[in-house]
């Protein structure tokens, strides 16, 4: 029977590197924490163990053990989290009572372990940056996992100086310009249980929400379906950070570039309001700051960045007469760096964390909608908190399964716009 907050562990088998024997460790767990994040190229897992059988020494656990897992919530439409990982660290071991030890096992994907050994030392191109990512995932990492790759604009040539595959992808992400119109081209590369994803934040924000969650008072009774959408706890670690925005370039950034071949110098200025209006958003067209704040803070440059580029030669007649390919094979970062810096700084200035009943279908990169009721003095018809309610992008997610069967999902998420206007009496 489906129950909110209850999970099912279908498989949790670890294989010894000494005897190749298989051990089901379900009865030993205190807690399983499965993590995904837009800031990490791989998923990971931590398992807290309560060991009263000296399992650690009898196996023995020496590192690099393989773990095969499968778990989910208990609803009929559940999506299983499943796959394999490698044990890379045992830590926090202590004797908690006679003949009983506790310790934590840290697992990561096989490709993360291999990433420390694999080397990318070649020149790729001319080709799309998105195709380079696919070449690395398929050709160097030898991964057959699904890959979702947002297409990039323009052919480019990149030389990788003996770096790991994930470092190479980071290099590509920092230079890739999205083929989408008016994109800030802030690319991220991350892993979910199902796929690798190479995408811009713009594209992620423009997805439709997969689920709506409600911050209901505890005394409100509801049926099982509504209860599954209840927010159990809500925390706002940062609502805004004005001084941090000044330092990071949220309000205004100047991008200067020099092309040493064509001997040209150029500069562009990007202010918060213009960059906001130039890109797409999840919830509407209202920035997260007031017009007055923009007038006071977003009219001057607070950060400057100098880039060495090859963009100047793309329009230089002499260079083009000698190397025609320069017209479309050049470094494009100067074309989007300002919008990217402003967008990323704005995104990281605020975030909220919520806990909900375990939901194995949620993953990093999903959009969700959050409804928070209005409190205090309010206008007739106001039913929701207009500042906090809205559409959010999941930046990081943790699925927590406890030994007693309890299953909770914790989410860190952020929004990039308001759905209602700050002026005109909406607030």
Give residue ranges: language-model regions.
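Short, charged, solvent-exposed linker or helix-capping segments at domain edges/interfaces
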Residues: 116-120, 209-212, 422-426
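Juxtamembrane "anchor/assembly" segments of surface/extracellular structural proteins
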Residues: 1-66, 70, 105-112, 148, ...
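Surface-exposed cap/loop segments at beta↔alpha junctions
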Residues: 54-147, 157-158, 173
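A broad structural signal for short, well-ordered beta-strand segments within beta-sheet-rich domains
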Residues: 26-35, 87-91, 154-156, 221, ...
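Extended, domain-scale alpha-helical bundle/helix-rich regions
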Residues: 200-206, 215-345
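Short beta-strand-centered interaction patches in the first periplasmic/extracellular domains
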Residues: 102-105, 109-111, 148-243
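Residues that flank catalytic or metal-binding motifs in active/ligand-binding sites
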Residues: 83, 103, 185, 192-194, ...
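Short, cationic low-complexity segments
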Residues: 68-73, 129-136, 219-231, 240, ...
């Amino acid at each position: 029977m489906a129950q909110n907050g209850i999970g099912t562990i279908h498989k949790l088998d670890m294989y010894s590197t000494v005897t190749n024997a298989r051990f089901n460790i379900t009865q030993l767990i205190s807690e399983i924490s499965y993590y995904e994040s837009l800031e990490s190229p791989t998923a990971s897992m931590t398992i807290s163990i309560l060991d009263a059988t000296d399992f650690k020494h009898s196996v023995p656990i020496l590192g690099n053990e393989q773990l095969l897992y499968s778990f989910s919530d208990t609803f009929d439409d559940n999506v299983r989290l499943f796959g394999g990982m490698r044990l890379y660290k045992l830590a926090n071991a202590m004797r908690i009572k006679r003949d009983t030890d506790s310790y934590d096992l840290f697992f990561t994907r096989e490709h993360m372990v291999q990433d420390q050994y694999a080397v990318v030392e070649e020149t790729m191109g001319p080709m799309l940056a998105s195709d380079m990512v696919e070449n690395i995932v398929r050709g160097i990492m030898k991964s057959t996992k699904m890959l979702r790759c947002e297409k990039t604009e323009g052919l480019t040539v990149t030389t990788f100086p003996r770096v790991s595959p994930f470092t190479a992808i980071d290099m590509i992400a920092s230079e890739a310009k999205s083929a989408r119109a008016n994109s800030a081209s802030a690319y991220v590369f991350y892993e979910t249980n199902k796929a690798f994803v190479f995408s811009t934040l713009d594209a992620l924000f423009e997805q439709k929400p997969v689920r709506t969650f409600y911050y209901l008072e505890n005394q409100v009774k509801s049926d099982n379906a509504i209860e599954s959408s209840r927010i159990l706890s809500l925390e706002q670690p940062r609502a805004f950070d004005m001084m941090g925005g000044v330092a990071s370039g949220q309000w205004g950034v100047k991008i200067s570039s020099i092309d040493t071949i064509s001997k040209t110098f150029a500069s562009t200025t990007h202010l918060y309001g213009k960059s906001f209006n130039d890109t797409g958003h999840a919830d509407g067209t209202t920035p997260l700051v007031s017009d007055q704040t923009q007038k006071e803070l977003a009219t001057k440059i607070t950060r400057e960045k100098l880039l060495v580029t090859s963009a100047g030669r793309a329009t230089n007649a002499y260079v083009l007469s000698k190397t025609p390919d320069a017209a479309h094979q050049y470094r494009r970062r100067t074309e989007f760096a300002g919008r990217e810096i402003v967008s990323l700084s704005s995104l990281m200035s605020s975030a909220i964390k919520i806990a909900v009943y375990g939901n194995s279908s949620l993953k990093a990169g999903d959009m969700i909608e959050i409804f928070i009721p209005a409190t205090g003095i309010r206008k007739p018809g106001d039913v929701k908190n207009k500042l906090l309610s809205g559409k959010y992008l999941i930046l990081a997610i943790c699925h927590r399964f406890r030994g007693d069967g309890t299953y909770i999902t914790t989410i860190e998420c952020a929004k990039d716009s308001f759905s209602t206007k700050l002026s005109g009496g909406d607030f």
